[in-house]
Amino acid sequence: MKLPRIGFISLGCPKALVDSERIITQLRAEGYAIVPTYQDADLVVVNTCGFIDAAVEESLEAIGEAVAENGKVIVTGCLGERPEEIQARHPAVLKVTGAHAYEEVMNAVHEHLPPLHDPFMDLVPPQGVRLTPRHYAYLKISEGCNHRCSFCIIPALRGDLVSRPIGEVMTEAERLVAAGVKEILVVSQDTSAYGADLGYRTGFWGGRPLRTRFQELARALGDLGVWIRLHYVYPYPHVDEVIPLMAEGRLLPYLDIPFQHASARVLKAMKRPAATENILAAIRRWREVCPELTLRSTFIVGFPGETEDEFRELLDFLEEARLDRVGCFEYSPVKGAAANALPDPVPAEVKAERHARLMEVQERISAARLRTRIGRTETVLVDEVVEEGAVARRRADAPEIDGQVFIDGATHLEVGEFVEATFEDADAHDLWARLAD
């Protein structure tokens, strides 16, 4: 008997990818086959992104393609919070659900493509179905956000902060490690707020009490013996408490911490922490405790009302902070964001020019910091083996968004293998290396 077949398109951030993995895991458990082409699918699920206008358009185009190529389409994800927009553009869509609406998605699938039988879990590995390579995985610890940044609509799309029970998070992490995962990337909308909504209550893992708190979770994950990387960390004072764990080697010495700007006035308009001097002081403290710390951040240029002097404050901040990795976005209005009502929009050509200037400054800083690694030997994790050699990452590099290490001729290595590499050359993003003697 032929299994019902589902095509699946996953768009957006790693947190959305985790949602896709959960839906696909349940589909597999219920006997649905996941297929790679529209032609082979009986129905298509599209997990969308609705964070910025470009992502909205990409999602709408993906939905349109699925409708044109297959005809039976269910839409979920962040853009699903705006069903009228989806249905106006694509009225043939069968069902629209919001973000992390797993049960609604499954009910829609059941309605339009019933399963052949009741669920049977032997089709699914204990760690669930993942969409990442086998050697690394994203671990989502919470959903939603309690902040109200004026440029952001995440709380409207995904709600306020809802932390997962710490025992559930740790059990999932253990299963990932047992399945051979070498690196766990901790994600959420606000990782360092973990447990705040639960009053940091005590949970249980492995029969022992464990507080539902960012610091305790980081410490427990650090005991699992794999790379643990922290993403989407908000600059709360208690972040200081995890830096010693990085210095000890229990966590990767890496923080993904979006600062967004450096001008006090712009930060206030963004409804972000507005004390840049405190951020610089924190960076100095962190580096004193953990000199190997890698800092990644993101910034927005061209926010409404941003002046040339305020933009130069941001450039001065970059010069002083000496961050390792930086992402930069030109501000664009997002439907439903409070910032849309702010006066004095920055012209598009000015936004583009400031973006280019910022990235030029940061490329010089990143290149200088990477050049200090030449001649050093470090442990790297192999992501890919190609004809020319191996492509790997350092502890300082997250997959997809950071740099890579190219090891010429190392075609005998295995994906997911840890090796020692000596760095011989660098640019602003990547390193070239040989296997250590």
From Swiss-Prot:
GO molecular function: 4 iron, 4 sulfur cluster binding; aspartic acid methylthiotransferase activity; metal ion binding; protein methylthiotransferase activity
Subcellular localization: Cytoplasm
GO terms of biological process kind: tRNA modification
GO cellular component, one term: cytosol
Keywords associated with the record: 4Fe-4S, Cytoplasm, Iron, Iron-sulfur, Metal-binding, S-adenosyl-L-methionine, Transferase
Pfam families recorded: Radical_SAM, TRAM_2, UPF0004
Residues annotated for [4Fe-4S] cluster 1 binding in this entry: C13, C49, C78
Catalytic activity: L-aspartate(89)-[ribosomal protein uS12]-hydrogen + (sulfur carrier)-SH + AH2 + 2 S-adenosyl-L-methionine = 3-methylsulfanyl-L-aspartate(89)-[ribosomal protein uS12]-hydrogen + (sulfur carrier)-H + 5'-deoxyadenosine + L-methionine + A + S-adenosyl-L-homocysteine + 2 H(+)
Record EC number: 2.8.4.4
Cofactor info, note text: Binds 2 [4Fe-4S] clusters. One cluster is coordinated with 3 cysteines and an exchangeable S-adenosyl-L-methionine.
Domain TRAM: residue ranges: 371-437
Enzyme superclass (EC): transferase
Domain MTTase N-terminal: start-end pairs: 4-114
CDD domains in the record: Radical_SAM
Main location: cytoplasm
Domain Radical SAM core, first and last residues per copy: 131-368
Source organism superkingdom: Bacteria
Cofactor(s) needed: [4Fe-4S] cluster
HAMAP family: MTTase_RimO
Function of the molecule: Catalyzes the methylthiolation of an aspartic acid residue of ribosomal protein uS12.
Similarity comment text for this entry: Belongs to the methylthiotransferase family. RimO subfamily.
Protein name: Ribosomal protein uS12 methylthiotransferase RimO
